A protein has these predicted regions:
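Mid-domain, small-residue-enriched loop/turn segments at the edges of structured enzyme/sensor domains
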Residues: 160, 214, 225-279
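Structured C-terminal helix/loop/strand segments within mature extracytoplasmic catalytic/sensor domains
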Residues: 2-140, 158, 166, 278-296, ...
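Active-site SXXK
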Residues: 156, 166-197, 217, 341
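A glycine-rich, coil/turn loop motif that links secondary-structure elements
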Residues: 163-168, 202-206, 253-262
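Short, conserved catalytic-motif segment at the N-terminal edge
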Residues: 142-166
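A conserved catalytic-loop motif detector
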Residues: 260-319
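Short helix- or helix-capping micro-motifs
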Residues: 212-221
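Short, well-structured active-site flanking segments
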Residues: 183-209, 281-285
Length: 372
């Protein structure tokens, strides 16, 4: 069929070539008809070609347009990435300034005060937030002394009450001692988390790994494990570590007790150091971070009561042998911001003191918008 069509297509051309001379009017008319048909066919062919080119061009344009959109989208992502990077650099710079800040600038006294560690922009609390915090603090004062510090690590702004009241910290100090071991000894290679440690004396537990002891200390608040760690590592640089952080060594190195008496201001300094260490991308730092997020008791976590909020803490509680304490301190992460919270009280531990401490934590947390 294809060859026949091809031959038929060329017949009119031969006819028009040889029969136009000296032919009859009818023959001439036939020739004109043939020429007209040829022209029509040619026009049709040209139209098809033009249509094909147009369709192809349109198809090409449709193909190009998504590519252009993709490029634009990628450019937007790059811009956002650059903005995020700039913001990250700004945050790092702010943290650097914050790390050099004098924590003695945190105001003291038995009134709720706000402060800034990096500039003169002192925040103002909303009346409702201030009233809730004052109410929770008053309830605590009915049972003992109380002091708090709460601040935003990104802005350096915070709120405090009685920042220098010294109370028995009980188990709240255990996480900070674990910080000393990991940051100073493990990261330097002096101590291996999986290395065996002999425990002895009245609290002998046989051979334990450093990892197991720290986990028992942080997650389960085990006293025997804590005493074993202090006996093993107090003389390996602990005093220098404390001094470099600007902490009163007489408070942190009380020879009469493995559990220091200290204040919210000291707690704020040490948990700022904790935040710096946990931001490091090391096996030990990430492991310790996970332990702090898994503590068996947290008055802060109970008070905030929000699964979207990450709380890494260590609480302390006791009501026996003349020692009274209900404390909690840690790091709170929400919406890309990290806060340091320290609550130190001499309330004898009970269900009521636990509820009051949780209420203080909630009231402090609710002031965060003013600290940005």
């Amino acid at each position: 069929m294809r060859n026949n069509a091809s031959r038929d297509e060329y017949v009119p051309q031969h006819g028009s070539r040889y029969e136009t001379k000296g032919t009859s009017s009818r023959g001439l008319a036939d020739a004109r008809v043939r020429v007209t048909k040829i022209a029509a066919i040619g026009m049709l062919t040209l139209a098809v070609i033009i249509l094909g080119i147009t369709v192809k061009t349109y198809a090409s344009e449709r193909t190009v347009r998504p590519d252009a959109s993709t490029v634009q989208l990628q450019n937007e992502k790059v811009s956002k990435s650059k903005a995020s990077a700039d913001q990250a650099l700004s945050t790092v710079d702010l943290k650097t300034r914050l790390s050099k800040a004098d924590f003695n600038d945190i105001p003291s006294g038995d009134t709720v005060r706000t402060f800034s560690l990096v500039d003169n922009k002192t925040p103002a609390l909303e009346d409702e937030s201030l009233a809730s915090l004052q109410d929770a603090l008053c309830r605590a004062q009915e049972l003992g002394d109380v002091g708090v510090v709460f601040y935003d690590l990104s802005s350096g702004r915070g709120v405090t009450y009685n920042a220098d009241v010294e109370v028995y910290g009980a188990s709240s100090y255990k996480a900070l001692y674990a910080l000393y071991i990991c940051e100073t000894l493990v990261e330097s290679g002096q101590v291996s988390l999986d290395g065996p440690l002999a425990t002895y004396g009245g609290y002998s537990m046989g051979w334990q790994t450093v990892r197991n002891l720290i986990e028992n200390v942080v997650v389960n608040s085990d006293n025997d494990s804590f005493i074993a760690l202090r006996a093993a590592f107090d003389h390996d640089g602990y005093e220098d570590w404390i001094a470099n952080l600007g902490v009163d060594d007489e408070t942190a190195l009380n020879p009469m007790s493995d559990f220091p008496t200290y204040c919210p201001r000291t707690s704020a300094k040490l948990w700022r150091e904790m935040s710096e260490y946990l931001s490091c991308d090391t096996e030990a730092s990430q492991w310790l971070s996970g332990l702090l997020a898994s503590t068996s008791r947290s008055f802060i976590r109970d008070g905030i009561a929000d699964e979207q909020v990450l709380v890494r803490n260590k609480a302390g509680w006791i009501s026996e042998d003349g020692y009274y304490s209900t404390c909690d301190a840690g790091l709170i992460d929400i919406d890309g911001c990290t806060y340091v919270m320290g609550i130190m009280t001499s309330m004898p531990w009970s269900d009521r003191s636990s509820e009051v401490t949780a209420a203080i934590a909630k009231a402090l947390f609710d002031t965060r918008a003013a600290l940005a």
